Amino acid sequence: MTTAKEPSASGKSVQQQEQELVGSNPPQRNWKGIAIALLVILVICSLIVTSVILLTPAEDNSLSQKKKVTVEDLFSEDFKIHDPEAKWISDTEFIYREQKGTVRLWNVETNISTVLIEGKKIESLRAIRYEISPDREYALFSYNVEPIYQHSYTGYYVLSKIPHGDPQSLDPPEVSNAKLQYAGWGPKGQQLIFIFENNIYYCAHVGKQAIRVVSTGKEGVIYNGLSDWLYEEEILKTHIAHWWSPDGTRLAYATINDSRVPIMELPTYTGSIYPTVKPYHYPKAGSENPSISLHVIGLNGPTHDLEMMPPDDPRMREYYITMVKWATSTKVAVTWLNRAQNVSILTLCDATTGVCTKKHEDESEAWLHRQNEEPVFSKDGRKFFFIRAIPQGGRGKFYHITMSLSQPNSSNDNIQSITSGDWDVTKILAYDEKGNKIYFLSTEDLPRRRQLYSANTVGNFNRQCLSCDLVDNCTYFSASFSHSMDFFLLKCEGPGVPMVTVHNTTDKKKMFDLETNEHVKKAINDRQMPKVEYRDIEIDDYNLPMQILKPATFTDTTHYPLLLVVDGTPGSQSVAEKFEVSWETVMVSSHGAVVVKCDGRGSGFQGTKLLHEVRRRLGLLEEKDQMEAVRTMLKEQYIDRTRVAVFGKDYGGYLSTYILPAKGENQGQTFTCGSALSPITDFKLYASAFSERYLGLHGLDNRAYEMTKVAHRVSALEEQQFLIIHPTADEKIHFQHTAELITQLIRGKANYSLQIYPDESHYFTSSSLKQHLYRSIINFFVECFRIQDKLPTVTAKEDEEED
């Protein structure tokens, strides 16, 4: 018999299980829990939104409402920085010019300003420049000014009694309504000189007939008291080549003779049926240089002309005069530099005998830099301070203040270094003899900054920074001191909007603002200005500074084109905390580019070892350093590798042309396009003083000149777009450079464009032409950076198959 058992759950039939599942009651929803969860989610979301709002900077909220910087802005009054051109004339007074044009005298002790010249008077005379006589009785105005080179000009001059006198023309006795090359007051009373046809005229006071005191001038050939082209551009860096003694009794002047210097002819294509030419003396590498001599004439009594004797040194067979400065009323300091520019001698010359005594000698295996520096003297002339390069360890020499003290009954001077360290003194400003202090600008803070310092000239030479943290958003300064040293004018040049303030020297306290350029601050605040970043890159044991300009709306997730801007003239500085609004600003603000600059080997203010690295091999190391800067930027995710460009002008044009064909790490093209403005392409075609300074004397060993030709580089140009811009009447870098370059580009079948400016000079004096120039450069890079839509192309064969 079989016993019946109760079936187990596992033994249930599939049908029974399905019936149970189907027939079971659904669970009740937990509505209360769902509501709580939703509430928590809403609270979290609101907290996130609140955090985002609170943490977002206020300026970002309004950024989209701000305007972008345009080319028009660069030339508008809103962006025009006003420099009051303040100048101390006594212990407590300075002269300055207001924005509306009125010239005033300000007394810092009484805090009272007096009108000297009404702005409307300057307007009525159409005057470009003005100068007040030392006795404040007369003003000298120039009008109808016509530029010659970078600094020089000709113009008509009038004298007018302050404040409301009628203008009277300033002319040589033999000519009326003459266009003068120069006119300016002396240090005392109403004495003045002017230069006409390269001859010097002296007037003891207004109303007295001028007398010609130097008459050896010959137009375009022999210059008295003025620079020729080479001295103006490369040596003295000014058109003025005369110097008053402190008491006004003597005048030192240079005579520059161009008679043996080859002539360059600048063509003028417009304005006549046949082109005309403007000839002028321009010494190229290896050619005859101008000769120079220094003379002193007495202005009281019969004119006596005495030449200062150059050093009796075989290394000085050919020389430049790079600096002249009066020490006393009878002693004048002169720096003589040999043609190779590797030996300089500082002398103190007796203006009554012409005998010059050597005070200091400097020599370099490369070249001597900063030879225009003026020493600062004590009142008796026995003590003076000058800047010289002093060894500071592995980075080579840096420029520091040396004090020289003449010993009684001894031909040897006692020399002491006032400053030291791996930073540069950039300028000596003043010596306070009573307080035993020297005032100067330096890069001690950072190479890209200029701060105002003082140092004791006795004891342990303690120094103090006077400008550090003194003015908000300002780290780049220049300054000038009152005659008593009790007050100083402090000029902020960046990174904020430039301004001028007046301070008490004792406690650095700001007394008042002279100029704040509020209109520019407002314009800047209303625009999408670039964000500025600084960083260092390491190359061959050097830390090289780099400046990066990013759009105001920058985000890491956007891809931006990269524009490398190069200058790199040996000893120059591209990375500096100075205020600037330029066409590069427009590229960043309006067109979303990232602009980068780098101070590589050959740049200044980082020691002579780095400076002299480029000797006899210009372009080679600069290319390496600039390419490293580009590679550093290409590692950033926000840079578009397919849109990289380079630009340079003058020497920078040489570098941009040199760098453009450079290959990347994978041997592909790095740059999409490049542009060069007035590029140097062959240094034997350029100014003797410049080329010979860095490449040696042409004719002795020309290998450096051959190696640095860009012709060797442009053959590697492939499909990159290349824009060359050059004015045809460029007096500094002749169009010949571009003509030589284009010849090589045609041979190499390169893709280039040329834009010329007929009959325009190197410095583009016309604002309308400058606007056109900037637009041309910007449009070229905007087109280069344009992202083209790549549509699939259909070949003829495929077209036939479809048919």
Curated annotation (Swiss-Prot):
Disulfide bonds join C349-C356, C465-C468, C474-C492, C673-C784. It is a single-pass type II membrane protein. Residues 55-803 are extracellular. Keywords: Cell membrane, Disulfide bond, Glycoprotein, Membrane, Signal-anchor, Transmembrane, Transmembrane helix. The chain crosses the membrane at residues 34-54. It comes from the Eukaryota. Residues 1-33 are cytoplasmic. Residues 1-19 have a biased composition (Polar residues). InterPro entries: AB_hydrolase_fold, Peptidase_S9_cat, Peptidase_S9B_N, Serine_Prot_S9B/DPPIV. Residues 1-24 are annotated as: Disordered. Its main location: membrane. One of its GO terms (cellular component) is voltage-gated potassium channel complex. One of its GO terms (molecular function) is serine-type peptidase activity. Glycans are attached at N111, N257, N342, N409, N473, N504, N751. N-glycosylated. GO terms for biological process: protein localization to plasma membrane; proteolysis; regulation of potassium ion transmembrane transport. It is found in: Cell membrane. Belongs to the peptidase S9B family. Homodimer (in vitro). Interacts with KCND2. Identified in a complex with KCND2 and KCNIP2. Forms an octameric complex composed of four DPP6 subunits bound to the KCND2 tetramer. Interacts with KCND3; this interaction modulates the channel gating kinetics namely channel activation and inactivation kinetics and rate of recovery from inactivation. Regulatory subunit of Kv4/D (Shal)-type voltage-gated rapidly inactivating A-type potassium channels. Modulates the activity and gating characteristics of the potassium channel KCND2 amd KCND3. Promotes cell surface expression of the potassium channel KCND2. Has no dipeptidyl aminopeptidase activity. This is A-type potassium channel modulatory protein DPP6.
